[in-house]
Amino acid sequence: GLDSRLIASGLKHFGYKKVKCFSYGKKNNFEAIAAKKIAKKLDYPWKFCEINRVNINKFYQTETFKNFIKNTNDGVATVGIQDVYAIYYLRKINFIKKSDIIVNGNSGDFISGGHIPIEYKKKTYLLNKKNSNKYESIINSIIKIHIKKHYSLWGKLYNNKNKKIIYNLLINQINELNIHNTKNINSHGLLEYLEFNNRQSKYVINLQRTYDFYNQKWKLPLWDKDFMHFWAQVPLNLKLGQKLYKEVLKELNFSGVWTKEYNVQYTIPSLRVTLIRGFLKALHIFSSKENWHKFERRYILYWTDNLYGLNIRPYKEIISNKNDARNSISWLSLNSEKITLGKHWQEQLPINN
């Protein structure tokens, strides 16, 4: 990816020698292929932690994993398991040592504009006293976009009642900014503010708890205050699609790893799964795109997920569940909810409750 590559190539560019890299996921996954090639160019040691159905299912049954789920739950956001097995394995083989500092690229994509919807190219607004009559409609549009993107882990819960509850919480956050008394605020900046205040600070950064669990030191250089302040000032046309970010990385070409030969396109590692997925998609040729994606999430994602995140539940349970889970995080949210509240929303509550 761009962000972790920036970290690694930047360290090399500025003369850091005691650096080692690692990747994880399915064998021959496209990111690992690119990472191996980049690490070789940088002359940094690189290790791959293969995740397959056998080793991950075994790990999910261990006390280590169960304690991780229990002890990293904070009642604010769903527990993230992205690299919990990789760190476990790499520590076990002594590739990662106690004294090591783990550095990743969170959250360069968000900070540099990668999460601003492309439709903002034509719909951005400047909020100020002059257009205060449009304030409500603009805010409604911003919140609607934000809710659709980040609050649909379960299709069944994505209803008007719940969206109204979320809307009220988000509007309170916006009102705290007291926009009416400010000179100018870009509407896309509000969208980024909502994500920063919620998903980024509560969930994405919470993924660092994996390293805390293993007592590993860590750094997040792309959350540097000066870096954040710079990107807050960048105009929309240079943030959409990370335009400025990508152009500068390519122009600087730290350590020579920003040319086309180091870019690998997304592929599904298993040819068999690719063929089966293609066949099933062909059967949905007369179905809507929405219905196809719902089918894919329910029946296929279990087999294509690079980290086997859905394996925390039996396949039979996943395909029999009709609540339209978005991905593995949907299922993890049930774990977090049960730890925090004693039950999750899909379990039958007592009649007197």
Where are these regions (language model features)?
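Active-site adenylate/phosphate-handling loop in enzymes that bind or generate adenylated species
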Residues: 87-161, 210, 215-225
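A conserved donor-nucleotide-binding helix/loop in the catalytic core
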Residues: 78-95, 193, 204-208
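Short, solvent-exposed loop/turn segments at secondary-structure junctions
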Residues: 2-4, 27-29, 53-56, 107-111, ...
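Adenosyl-5′-phosphate
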Residues: 97, 153-353
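A phosphate-binding catalytic loop at a beta-strand-loop-alpha-helix junction
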Residues: 1-17
